[in-house]
Amino acid sequence: MKNQHKKSNQLSLLNIIVIVCYLCLLVGTPISVLNFWTNGENEVLNQLWVIPACTQLLLAAIWWLSREAFPTSATYLRRCFACMTLAYVITFITRIVPTDYTEVSVQTMIAITIYGISGIIAFVASIMISVRLIRHYTGSKHTLGIVIIAGLVTNILCSLVQGIYPIVAEADVQTVKTVHSACTVISTAIFAVTVSYLHTIVKETEAAKLSTGTEETGETA
């Protein structure tokens, strides 16, 4: 009974986090795009930069709360989700530290390096999870693995564009900013779909467990 109550609280918490995550994606995407187009010179946008950065932590929380819904080895999954969560936390810290990406400096290089490493960790962990998911699920559920990988690839591309910006800024600012904006929007859309899939799978799993538990109780009675 206690375990069931804990699961119910966990699902309620997940529902709240998913809603907040969607709001952050909705509000944070235009902030992220505008902040890049204004070269980080707008003070209001700089203050609001924490909103898109918070999305990383929310996604980590969603991944962590969803981990039990996946039909894989518990130890294997725990390691994958631990890596994913760590990567998003590192990304969050990197993003909230004020960094002028328009200048080539030691701080910029360190920020880009850390951002890149955390992106690779998240990318590898997601592939490991996705492979297990694709093996297990059939039909439309195959999409989940592809969506997760596509989302991370696009997100890493955003980071790369940000990284090469100081180098090519003088050559073709417009193209770099356009590519970054497009990647940000696409990445947001893909992450929104990922969150939706994760949320749906968790709800379906919990409903199935509840249904099985009810049937077993009925049979016992």
PLM regions and their residue ranges:
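Cytosolic juxtamembrane helix at the C-terminal end of the final transmembrane segment
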Residues: 3-11, 63-77, 126-144, 191-215
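Alpha-helical transmembrane segments
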Residues: 14-29, 86
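Juxtamembrane "helix-exit" motif on the non-cytosolic side of transmembrane helices
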Residues: 30-40, 93-105, 160-172
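Alpha-helical transmembrane segments of polytopic membrane proteins
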Residues: 45-57, 110-123, 176-188
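Transmembrane alpha-helical segments of multi-pass membrane proteins
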Residues: 75-91, 144-157
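Membrane-proximal helix-loop-helix units in multi-pass membrane proteins
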Residues: 89-140
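Alpha-helical membrane segments in multi-pass integral membrane proteins
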Residues: 116-131, 139-164, 186-190
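C-terminal transmembrane-bundle signature of multipass membrane proteins
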Residues: 152-221
